[in-house]
């Protein structure tokens, strides 16, 4: 469900090894189209699909045994309902931490230098710098909340920009802090002394 051309291309290429029968639906899974799962063993969904208790119940009645997510998050799935229905749920365990960290830097640069707005203006023939001025990241302070694998790679990149780094984590890695010359501090200190703040932690309810 929720498939794009690149999904179909990837699945078709990999399926040459297995020969599974695969049905592709562009629409997102929900209670209105869950009947399409009739007669299938597994259903594959993405972030905008809905697998709540009602959808899970219908899938189980249709004989679905596996629900595979093409993403790391699973907040769109009622895990308790799936377990009760005997449907196994699997997900992407992790993305490339380098890709996520590098994309984070790209977002920082885009926000700081107002790159999207500048792009729109130049397409309209407007080359004014008014409202587009950013600041040099060199010498500024980045506040990083959560210092897991992705955040550590991000910190290494930001140090290459010549930035100072303040960090907060419930379980500080002081060996890493010494290696990268960063400072663990309180959230309050981080909020008040950072020019840029980046969050790298799980969603907490």
List each model region and its residues.
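Rossmann-like dinucleotide/phosphate-binding beta-alpha-beta segment
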Residues: 130-205
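An N-terminal-biased, well-structured beta-alpha scaffold segment characteristic
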Residues: 1-88
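Short, charged, surface-exposed secondary-structure boundary motifs
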Residues: 76-80, 99-103, 177-178, 195
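Structural detector of well-ordered beta-strand residues that form the stable sheet scaffold
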Residues: 66-68, 88-90, 128, 166, ...
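Phosphate-binding beta-alpha-beta segment of Rossmann-like dinucleotide-binding domains, i.e.
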Residues: 85-87, 93-141, 153-156, 160
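Conserved beta-strand termini and adjacent loop/short-helix elements that scaffold enzyme active sites
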Residues: 25-27, 92, 168, 187
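Short gly/ser/thr-rich secondary-structure transition/capping motifs
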Residues: 23-29, 47-48, 121-130, 177-184, ...
């Amino acid at each position: 469900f929720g498939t794009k051309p690149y999904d179909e291309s990837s699945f078709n290429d990999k399926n040459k090894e297995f020969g599974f029968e695969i049905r592709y639906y562009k629409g997102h899974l929900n209670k209105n189209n869950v009947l399409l799962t009739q007669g299938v063993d597994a259903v594959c969904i993405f972030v905008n699909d809905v697998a709540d208790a009602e959808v899970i119940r219908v899938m189980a009645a249709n004989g679905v045994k596996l629900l595979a997510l093409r993403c790391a998050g699973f907040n769109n799935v009622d895990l308790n309902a799936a377990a009760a229905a005997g449907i196994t749920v699997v997900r992407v365990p992790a993305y490339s931490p380098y890709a996520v960290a590098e994309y984070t830097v790209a977002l920082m640069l885009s926000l700081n230098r107002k790159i999207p707005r500048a792009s729109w203006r130049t397409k309209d023939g407007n080359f004014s710098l008014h409202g587009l001025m950013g600041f040099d990241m060199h010498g500024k302070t980045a506040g990083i909340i959560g210092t897991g694998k992705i955040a550590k790679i991000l910190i290494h990149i930001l140090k290459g920009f010549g930035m100072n780094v303040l960090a907060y984590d419930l379980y500080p890695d002081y060996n890493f802090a010494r290696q990268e010359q960063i400072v663990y501090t309180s959230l309050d200190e981080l909020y008040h002394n950072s020019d840029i703040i980046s969050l790298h932690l799980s969603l907490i309810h």
